[in-house]
Amino acid sequence: MSSVSSDIDGPPETKRFRIDVDTQVGIDTPSVSTNCAPPVAGEASQDGQSPAAPSSASYRSSNSSVISSSESPIKDEDVDVHDGQDDTEDIAMDVSGSTGSIVNNSEIFEMLNKTFGGVFNCDLEGIMRPSALMHPSSPPTPIQSAGIPGALAVAQSPAAQLFSGDDWSWHRNPAASIRSGGTNKQTPVWKYFVYNKTENLSRCIVGDCTYMLKGPHTSTLACHLKKHTREYSEFQKLKTEYSRTKLDQQPKIPDGAPHPLTLQTQNTPRQTGSPASTCNTNSNTSSSVSSGSGIGSGSGSTMDLSMKKPKKEPSSAKLNEMLFNGLRQATNNSNGSPPTTPHAPQLPNIPSFVTNMMLQMNPLHMMLAQSLPGATPPTPTSSNAGLNALQQAGLTLAANGQIIQSKKWRNDDKKQKELCTKFALALATSHVDFEVVQNPLWKEVFEMAQPKFSIPTESQYEHIVNSTSHKLIQSLKSQLSASKKLNLLLDITKITADISRVTVSVALTGGAGNSYETQVILLAFRNINGNQSEDLTAVFEKVLQDYNISPSSINRVICSGLNELAEPAELPKQMDSFSSRLANCFKSWLETSPTVEVLKKNVYAMLVSYLTVPAAIQLASQMLKAKFEVPLTEPFHVIVEHLVAHRDIYQMNMEGITLISEREWNKVTGIHHLMNIFKPFMTYSTDMTTVDTVIPTIVQIQNVLEKDIYHLGDIGSDLLTSLKQTVAPIMNPEHENFDSTYIQATALNPQLAVTLTSDQMTTAKSLIETEISRRTKKMRKAQSDKKLAMGVDSLLANVMRKNDGGSDGGCETALAIYGDLFQSITGNSSESKENIVNQYFDEISSTTSVESMFMLRTFGNPMQAPLSYWKSCSSRCSELSDLATELLSIPIFTLTAERVLSFSPDSSSLNTNLILTNLDSTDQFEKQVLLRFNRQIVSKLFN
């Protein structure tokens, strides 16, 4: 009892320390009521640690020591260090033992949150907080604050005021803080150096030393101080005293009370400072804590202080160990096992998503899955989600189950995203299932090509394809809405007797300067439910609705393959493609010409004879060094190409083989020559061919046939007759089905207009004048229907009445005042539109080339590209320029299914197997085809 009474009679005598001030001011420093001395800073510095030494302001705001009012000085040697350290260790062990599970789990979640970048970003206080019924809440004792012993006094001393703001010589007091840059453990070095801020130089003031350093770098100055042995030894002692870290005060925990960590969110608002452990140098501190009564429990005269060591980043092995310990602790609590400490609070159930994530991170913990509260066995989907979370954080699982740094790119890395996009699009546009990626050989290929690349999952693959397809559709809609007139291309391809495919595309004209070009964009590749014209019309209207295309914005609908339907279809502004007309002309000639029919019989007889002689097939294979096949079932134009390519084989004279004559070989060669002439105009090509080139092409073909008719004989004459019948609606204005589009387009091309005859030129001029007059009247009517604001219409009516009254002077005065208003109604120019058309035809129909070069031109340079030429003339006559642009942008062919489905530009055969295998997924197949054909637009979406 005597010892207890001596403890409660009053606080022990406080020990004080002082700091020697080297300036001319002597001030007794206030004392701190504490018996807990910190560890020697010299030992900390020798161990490689860096004690914190913040500025005086931050130091004062966070310090929790109590300043005594005693003024009696005492020596520094009176401070008892060893007793305080022993008691500190005892109490720290006691507190940590009672709250070990709480701190352990809080550290686990804190490490997980740092490691996985916010994956475990949850309310840890809610998880770690025990029930309020388990422990009565007791508010913590208010914490008092005080300044730094000596530092505040020196900073406010008259001696410090004698120095200017840019003079750091007053910092030679080791306890004072640097006014302009904060403090660190090297601050006492300013006792031996002086810094001038104006010169940015630090000078040594030890003896006669002339050392100077640019800048106030304390570490470099401390290295120089090693040359002065006595001063350096003194500097080490000063640094040891100055390197004391901040001490946070924490009230004592009564018996049965919860740890302050669990009460932080219940009783006090959240603070930026972290809670600290407690210590006391009194010999009976342990007993007072356990009994709940002591010196510090009822009053704030003495506070418990401890050293807070900086946290170190946990290693992967430590992280796995802590995860395992946390799961084991939770398992013990759920099974009813006795806690390791007698008064440890019970840990509540961990949320299931946190437990499942912890299980997915390390396979070694999965054996605890059945006993974890709220946990469910991990599925392959959840395991993949956990691995994806690791990959997103730049981590991975090692073979032993440890979480290590990943060598692969993060999921949000730019290169990883680019390669994932290209890989997904390449896989989708090749019409290959994602299951092919499960082949280990593919993983080996990617691992060798780019080890840092991670193959995307199936969900990521689908997301990339769907999002890119959506972006493509939106981009196409914006391009279509920006165009005034659209030329739609429609082609019908018959796959089987009951399966047909329609290909809808659009030809857009764009460019600048002299580089105008027409681009073909695929819009749809869809199935026709029947072979009636209504089925085609329904599909066409659905495409227009999907892309928000108004019928008024359609210039022409170029069609091909309509003969595949049972009934002829009628679409708005429909126009048959010239390429399909020319192809039908050539094919009908091969099927109906009597001369070609006789040649066919002889050629088929020769091919059959080769099939009956195996030795001939074997010899042909030896000559080709490959298997030789006879194309007996192919169309005749394919057979002609085959015969010309292997003429030496079919001229072998062997027993049992029927050969054709030399004259017939000449006919075969002539047919092949004609095929080469027609072929560029019958198939799709990347070089856009427009309708203004049709008439010059027809004239050229006719000239070739008339020139070579002597060598071709009846074959040439039959083809010439068939060609004239086919092109009659284009060339002859007197034909009942005459299409004036070709003549007008050719006349509006200043380079090809000379190929027209005088009759054709006159017809084209008359048609163009009529169209321009119609458009001008339509524009004036639209302008007159608009009511002018602010009474301008009545003002204009007065002007027009003065003009009709015959008063020339009044009319001239009115027009002089309201000239712009009058021209806005009557026309932008006084020059007649018909006169502009006549002037254009006069310029392009000059007699000689020399005259054409030196004559004064008002429309531009005729050597420009046609679209560029009319773009430059739009200010002269907008109606004529718009008409020319519309006609000169109409293509002569359509985009066929063969071209859409071919992977190589040289391939011309239809891949029917690709269509038949995707009959059940037509929408997905169309999406893939659009991405592949419009790959140039897709590439611009990611630039």
Swiss-Prot record:
GO-annotated molecular function: protein dimerization activity; zinc ion binding
Disulfide bond residue pairs: none
Segments forming BED-type zinc fingers: 184-235
UniProt feature, compositional bias: Polar residues: 262-276, 328-338
Stretches the record annotates as Disordered: 1-99, 242-315, 328-348
Function: Regulates the timing and orientation of distal tip cell migration during gonadal development. May act in parallel to cacn-1 and Rac GTPases to control the anterior and posterior migration of distal tip cells.
Protein name: Zinc finger BED domain-containing protein 39
Protein's organism: Caenorhabditis elegans
